[in-house]
Each structure stands twice: as C-alpha cells, then as structure tokens.
Amino acid sequence: MEISWGRALWRNFLGQSPDWYKLALIIFLIVNPLIFLISPFVAGWLLVAEFIFTLAMALKCYPLLPGGLLAIEAVFIGMTSAEHVREEVAANLEVLLLLMFMVAGIYFMKQLLLFIFTRLLLSIRSKMLLSLSFCVAAAFLSAFLDALTVVAVVISVAVGFYGIYHRVASSRTEDTDLQDDSHIDKHYKVVLEQFRGFLRSLMMHAGVGTALGGVMTMVGEPQNLIIAKAAGWHFGDFFLRMSPVTVPVLICGLLTCLLVEKLRWFGYGETLPEKVREVLQQFDDQSRNQRTRQDKIRLIVQAIIGVWLVTALALHLAEVGLIGLSVIILATSLTGVTDEHAIGKAFTESLPFTALLTVFFSVVAVIIDQQLFSPIIQFVLQASEHAQLSLFYIFNGLLSSISDNVFVGTIYINEAKAAMESGAITLKQYELLAVAINTGTNLPSVATPNGQAAFLFLLTSALAPLIRLSYGRMVWMALPYTLVLTLVGLLCVEFTLAPVTEWFMQMGWIATL
C-alpha cells in the first residue's frame, strides 16, 4: 500500500535523518521569527546555538541542509540582508578559493603522499614516535600551507590505508563501498576496529599539529594574514612576534602527544595491528614491483609540484586558492589526467564544505548586524592594559570555539586598531594585543570542530564515518590538547609575551613601526 502524501513529504524532508532531528529543526524554524520579534539580540544568539547544534549532529545530517534552512530564514525575516551575506562571501573569497582549488589540487598528489606516508608508517614501529612524526609533519607543513590543505593530505592518506585493508578484509579486489562491512567476518572486524582506533589517533595528532604550526606564521591560517596586514608585519616579523607564546606551546603540545600515547588516555594508544601492517607491507612491495617508468615520472613530477607549492605559499607569490589552481593545472597536465570526469572527482570532497562555509558566512552576517559580540568587546577594552592581553586571549578563545576563526580574529584586530587610532591604547600595546588575538584565536579553538575549520572538514569528510570519528569523540580526544595549549598559551601571554618582546626590541630583531 502506497504511503500518504504527508508521510511521503516527511520522509523526503532531510532524508534518512532521525525523526527527532527533523522535528527539532522544524521547531527552530517556527520559534526563531517569534523570538526575533521580541528580542533580535536573543534571536541572534539562539541562531548561533542552533547552527552549532547542526554542526554537532553532522553525522545525523550534513550541516549544509539544516544550517542552510536556518540561514535562509534568517535573511528572510530580516536578521541580516542578502547584500551583507554577499559582502561577507566576497571578503572571504580567499578562503573559498582555498577550499575549491587547493584541496582539489592535493587530490592529484595523493600517489606521492600515499607513497611517503606508507613508507613512514611501515618504517616506524613505535606508535609514540609515529604519532610524534605525524604531529611534527603536520605542524611543519601547516606553517607554510593552510591547515585545511594539510588535513586534506592526511585524510587522503588515511582513506588510502583504510581502503587497502578493507578490500582485503572483505575479500574483494575491486573498489567497493568502504562503509559496507557486511562481507567481513568477525575476526577481520576485530582487527578493523583496532585499525580504526589507530587511524583516529593519527588523525587527531595531525589535526592538532596543524594548529600548533599554523599559529606560528602569517600564512599558516587565513586570519593570520589579516592580523599581519593590520599590524604591518612581514613573514619574519610575524614569526618572531608570536614566538614568545607559540614556541613554548609547540613544545608542550608535542610532549602532550607523547604523554597521551604512552598512558593510552582519551582514546589514544591504539597500535597498528600486525595483520594490517602485513597487508600494507604487501601492498607497498607489490606497488614497487609493478611501478613502471611512467609511474615513477608521476611521483617525481608530483614531488616537484610539492616543492613549488611550499615555495609559492612561503613567499606568498599569489593567493592560496590560485596557487592551488596552478597545482591542479600542473599535476593534471604532467601526469596525463585529461578526462573531465577524472578531474571532477577531485572536487567532490571540497565543494560541499565550501557551500557549508558560505552558509556560515550568513550566520557571521547575523552576528555583525545584531552586534552579538559588542558587549564583550566593550568590556575587554575597559580593562587595564596588562589585563587586556589575557582578556583578549580568553574571549578570543571562547568565541573562536563556537564561531569562525577568520571572523573572530578580524573583529578583534579591527576593534584593537580602532582603539589604537583613537588613542585609547598605545601602538606598543596594540602590537602585543595583536599577538594575544592571534594566539587566542588559534590555540583554544582546538576544543571543538566549530572552532577549527580543519577539524570541521575532518568531521564532515568521507573518512569520519569510516573510522567512527563523531563530534563527541573528537571533542573528547582533543581535550588534553585543549587544556595544555590553552593554559600554556595563557601563561605565556600573561608572563613571557611582554618581557621577551621587549628583549627582541633591545636586540634589534623587531621594531615598532
């Protein structure tokens, strides 16, 4: 018997999402206009909370759908305007270009990356050293690349590892649905579950590594560029200015990596199953034996393109997204990928997230129009100069964990610059505040996927359901890093930032403009 029209509409609405989730979203859509009529300020914060809820439930339904519906309603009822949303999108075009082109460009370097990381994984048997190497590699790369790019690299490697073993475990040689475990017997499932735990820990170490490295340089994160430009700093200036905070944080972060692996805390410590190692070793041996000269040329070309990528980003020869586009063009041209459909596959991972980020910019527009952060900013600027550093750091951290890092960093640096230009604070204090804003925006935000775009990208990637990495599990595994990075960063802002910066000036390494 065919279902009713109403039932059919209900089933189509948000597809396979649970009924309670669908009902919750409908309630949000009904309540928001009513609250907006009473108090636009409260309605604005309610919208932010609802959007965070959709992100937290990312595995129930991709946040683009419910978040998009909330954003459309927000524009429709007047919480913001379509023109303001367009302005926010235009202001963040660099980030969108990064997602569209840089992430896709990495897709065409997966052969080289899989080769390198397979050798790394097979040559380092100690899980502690392997975790440390992933964290250090991610930190180093994210000092020159955007964190999203680095996470995209590690995701592609992890999916490659998982796919190799999954095909063996399911006794299927051709490409299969990696989420389908129905053809795997109980013995293989136990090993597969251990392998998932192993990959989860590596992904989290790498993800935190991007935060450790990304905060150190002006090209590490999009907001770093904005802050560096506002302060008039170049690459070397930015690194030295941040180092009183970022260097101790990096050291403590790496020690935390070793500690959680050693003590098997917070879901870490899972080792690579020997059976999986054997499969990966066989795959590596087979790949090397079957590698033709044409394949070797591809690897060499990809390595050269990798050098170009790091060099172009370090010297900021062009916008990040345009450099990514050059990677796509060079990699496809020189490795023989000419089919439109083959090229199109590179964009399947990044474009949904690009659309999601665009939706988020509409929420940012609401935050600005409803002046949701104004009371916080006014409170901070009324404090003493010494207290301002810690308060800027703390409030940046709190807001960055629930909002867009680029937005939070931009708002605070603009407010600090306005205060400096009006004479409320000195130029020297402004430069110290710029460091507090940058570190406060980057470090505490590892607490949730909402704060780190790289974490959110990981959570909503094709890898997350494969390795059972949910929102809650990600927050739990990030907790030791959150505590260490946040507290060490705060202590450095409080006690070492001003004296070390003063010493740098006396040595002539940096100067106030």
Curated annotation (Swiss-Prot):
Described function: Na(+)/H(+) antiporter that extrudes sodium in exchange for external protons.
Organism: Escherichia coli O6:H1 (strain CFT073 / ATCC 700928 / UPEC)
Membrane topology: Multi-pass membrane protein
Catalytic activity: 2 Na(+)(in) + 3 H(+)(out) = 2 Na(+)(out) + 3 H(+)(in)
Identification of the protein by name: Na(+)/H(+) antiporter NhaB
NCBIfam families per UniProt: NhaB, PRK09547.1
Ranges annotated as spanning the membrane: 23-43, 52-72, 97-117, 120-140, 144-164, 202-222, 238-258, 303-323, 348-368, 391-411, 447-467, 475-495
Keyword tRNA processing in annotation: no
GO molecular function: sodium:proton antiporter activity
Record has Transmembrane as a keyword: yes
Taxon lineage: Bacteria, Pseudomonadati, Pseudomonadota, Gammaproteobacteria, Enterobacterales
GO cellular component entries: plasma membrane
Domain of life (superkingdom): Bacteria
Chief place where the protein resides: membrane
The gene coding this protein: nhaB
